[in-house]
Amino acid sequence: MTISSSPTHHWEDFSLGEVREFGAHTVTAEEIVRFAREFDPQPFHLDEEAGRASLFGGLAASGWHTCALVMRMMCDAYLLDSSSLGSPGLEHIKWLKPVMAGDTLGVRMTVLETRPMASKPHIGLVRCAWAVLNQRRETVLTMEGWGMFGRRPAPALAAAGEGQS
């Protein structure tokens, strides 16, 4: 899937205080181990027994794995059908509870601020808070950061000369 060449969601479609809930991904032991082998090979992400001996009490997903899952859920929910231009970064990220095999994750996004980019007025900035919730509605991760979105194009004149006197 790629970003839409004619997106339906632009900067103007984000409203201050708006809350969106999206995603439902059930984490498997196999994907926890696969991600950990590639990107975060700490024992408690690779082996159930090592996980049980850790403060997590079982095989736990890497926090970076959880972040990658959030990114995918954001893409599926709205980014791929938007005028997204990327992100200048996150202001904070906190891992609050371990994500274990069998957990089903979803995301609650709250729009905290919207404003045009001062140096590039055709781009709008959106600051959001994301809370990642498991199937028990426990918050396992919080993030806050900015997204950049293209602004909605001005409507084209219907015919040459329209609006002239």
Question: Would you name each region that the model predicts?
Answer:
Residues 2-89, 154-165:
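Hot-dog-fold acyl-thioester-processing enzymes
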Residues 1-15, 95, 99-104, 108-165:
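HotDog/MaoC-like acyl-thioester-processing domains
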